[in-house]
């Protein structure tokens, strides 16, 4: 039975679970980093996980050691009161100082060594604690504590007292930064006198190289990059290397530039699409467009005044059976039934097929058609009795279509119309 579990990581490298990497692998990681390889490249070359490479390099940059820390136990506290007071002093002298600059000053002034120097995250935590204590304490208590930490007896009751030896409130920041720059020169002199001055200088240079600022491109470089971006948004590694040799930039910087440029292009394309949609959409909808001609068919113009009344309900007709019959029939052209047409008796099958359309009241044959006459024609229609054979009435077949029909004066039988409509 094995005491430890061995495995293979996602890159194909072998590791022992819970145990640190061998010293030979750690040394190779540092050597590759000094030669300029990126952590992701080191991870692929040595088949070590990216997190492990970053952790080893980060500890090497901070402490200069590649040895693993002790497994188990607690780390001794490195942010001692003396170190905290120095950090507060540096922050007062130059409020814009960075944590890694404070760390360098602690090393250069001999406050800490490589073994007990606090990390950048520890210094940031100390600065946050100082800021929170400043908010919790009152103004007087804060000034007393700062005077105690600074070891001075001057008056701290006013704002300019934060910067000793100065009279203009805006000047101390520059003086403090100048003092810090002077301390940086002392850093070089002190570290050069040490035993491991060369190694420390190499480590600091490598650290500065990794902690780079934003790349500033010249106009020629920007023009070359934009020209390549117009050709393709995704250049391959050969195109990037050719462009890197042409404009004297690292291939990694060119790759990052193209990634950022593609993101910018997507944002601009989104804005262009929004403007295009806004320009195509009308600002207001016309009133006429809300009524579609496919839904509402136009009603033909009436030929006679009587045809303006298109349904039985508008003429005072309360018989719903006839109203439904007229509205359900398709529109037909106007025609006239003459008196000489043969009077065919209704076929029983045809009569039964339209039995649902006729009223059940037996008085329908005896009703006159003056009910369908509009009010303004009552006088004219009353002067001509319906009993004469020459009287013409208008029957409504569908809305908007008038059918003048000659009705025999002897017997106005409704059943004569249905064979004609089939």
Swiss-Prot record:
Predominant location category: nucleus
Phenotype for residue 73 to D: In AN1; shows almost no binding efficiency; transcriptional activation ability is about 80% of that of the wild-type protein
Effect of substituting residue 126 to D: In AN1; atypical form
Any matching Pfam family: Homeodomain
Result when mutating residue 64 to V: In foveal hypoplasia; associated with presenile cataract syndrome
Region annotation Disordered: where it falls in the sequence: 162-201, 269-311
Modification after translation, per record: Ubiquitinated by TRIM11, leading to ubiquitination and proteasomal degradation.
Keyword Repressor assigned: yes
Biased composition (Low complexity): 281-294
Subunit structure: Interacts with MAF and MAFB. Interacts with TRIM11; this interaction leads to ubiquitination and proteasomal degradation, as well as inhibition of transactivation, possibly in part by preventing PAX6 binding to consensus DNA sequences. Interacts with TLE6/GRG6.
Family to which this protein belongs: Belongs to the paired homeobox family.
Name the record gives this protein: Paired box protein Pax-6
Source species: Homo sapiens (Human)
């Amino acid at each position: 039975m094995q005491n430890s579990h061995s495995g293979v990581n996602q890159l194909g490298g072998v590791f022992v679970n819970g145990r640190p990497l061998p010293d030979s692998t750690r040394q190779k990681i540092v050597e590759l980093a000094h030669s300029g390889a990126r952590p992701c490249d080191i991870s692929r070359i040595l088949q070590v996980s990216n997190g492990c490479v970053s952790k080893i390099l980060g500890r090497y940059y901070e402490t200069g050691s590649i040895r693993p820390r002790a497994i188990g136990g607690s780390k001794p506290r490195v942010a001692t009161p003396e170190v905290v007071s120095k950090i507060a002093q540096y922050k007062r002298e130059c409020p814009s100082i960075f944590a890694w600059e404070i760390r360098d000053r602690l090393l250069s002034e001999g406050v800490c060594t490589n073994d007990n120097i606090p990390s950048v995250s520890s210094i940031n935590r100390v600065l946050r604690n100082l800021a929170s204590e400043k908010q919790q304490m009152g103004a007087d208590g804060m000034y007393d504590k700062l005077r105690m930490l600074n070891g001075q007896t001057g008056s701290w009751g006013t704002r300019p007292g934060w910067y000793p030896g100065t009279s203009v409130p805006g000047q101390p920041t520059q003086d403090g930064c100048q003092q810090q720059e002077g301390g940086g020169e002392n850093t070089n002199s002190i570290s050069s006198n040490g035993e491991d001055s060369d190694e420390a200088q190499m480590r600091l240079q490598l650290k500065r190289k990794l902690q780079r600022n934003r790349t500033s491109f010249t106009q020629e470089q920007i023009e070359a990059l934009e020209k390549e971006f117009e050709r393709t948004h995704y250049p391959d590694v050969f195109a990037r290397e050719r462009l890197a040799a042409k404009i004297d930039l690292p291939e990694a910087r060119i790759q990052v530039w193209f990634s950022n440029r593609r993101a910018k292009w997507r944002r601009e394309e989104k804005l262009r699409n929004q403007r295009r949609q806004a320009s195509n959409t009308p600002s207001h909808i016309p009133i006429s467009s809300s009524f579609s001609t496919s839904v509402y068919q136009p009603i033909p113009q009436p030929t006679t005044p009587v045809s303006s009344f298109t349904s039985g309900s508008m003429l005072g007709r309360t018989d719903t059976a006839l109203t439904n019959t007229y509205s359900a029939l398709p529109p037909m052209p106007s025609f006239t039934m003459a008196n000489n047409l043969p009077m065919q008796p209704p076929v029983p099958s045809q009569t039964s097929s339209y039995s649902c359309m006729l009223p059940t009241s037996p008085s329908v044959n005896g009703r006159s058609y003056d009910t369908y006459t509009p009010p303004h024609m009552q006088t004219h229609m009353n002067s001509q009795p319906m009993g004469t054979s020459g009287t013409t009435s208008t029957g409504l077949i569908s809305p908007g279509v008038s059918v003048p029909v000659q009705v025999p004066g002897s017997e106005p039988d409704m059943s004569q119309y249905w064979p004609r409509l089939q």
